[in-house]
Amino acid sequence: LLARLDDNRGWLAKALAGAVIALGHPSNPFVADADSASALLLADGDDIHLIASDDVTLTRAESFDPFRRLFSVEWTPSPATKVGSNWGDTADRGALLAAAQMIGLAQRCIDLAVAYAKDRVQFGKPIGSTQAVKHMISSAQVKVEFARPVVHAAAAELPVATLASRARVAHAKIAAGAAADVASRMAVQAHGAMGMTWEVDLHFFLKRAFALNYAWGSPAVHGETISARIATLPTGPDATFASEVT
């Protein structure tokens, strides 16, 4: 986003040198890691404002995920702080990044569950040798494997910036969110009651999956994008199984 602004006031170079720029996009009610940022990109309607951290007032917000530092930001927009008026595909990029994170999170949960199922012995044999545990883990892996190519396809088409590409991002966000939800819950279940204690880290994965699922657009919001795309497609027997042309 900084690179596309005509007036980034030198913050692009500062960001490349390591300065933190927090992003307050209209789709997110709070700004993540605003307390560690040197400057913030904030929205006032469709306008983009670049504000130094000294010119805002931050209030810490509670988060379901204890490792996400979220803040509400009080600030005053002015012509001097305005640097643009087009958020472009920022929301799509944020949603795609969240989807990619959830795929990685889901896979890590499965890997932890597999390792524990191999190591935990009950009634003289590893719990992973039972069909119930095998099927539970396998179902989560299938969910991830079906979501992963959806995320890859969305990433490949993101630069096109059409309704079709936005629908692919929406599909990726929904699919990855569902996979992360299933995998994180499965991993907790595979570990038994211990899975929701501070003795293991699984509850952090579950909480992050929940938080990311609603960051950069909820499933309902992305479902509306997909619905809008479907409404543009031809209907009828000749079009039902036709390949989509973007």
Where are these regions (language model features)?
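Solvent-exposed alpha-helices and their adjacent loops that cap or buttress functional pockets
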Residues: 15, 31-35, 63-67, 88-91, ...
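A broadly conserved detector of short glycine/acidic/proline-rich loop/turn motifs that flank catalytic sites
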Residues: 46, 54-55, 77-79, 102, ...
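Flexible, glycine/proline-enriched loop segments at strand-loop-helix junctions
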Residues: 27-29, 58-64, 93-100
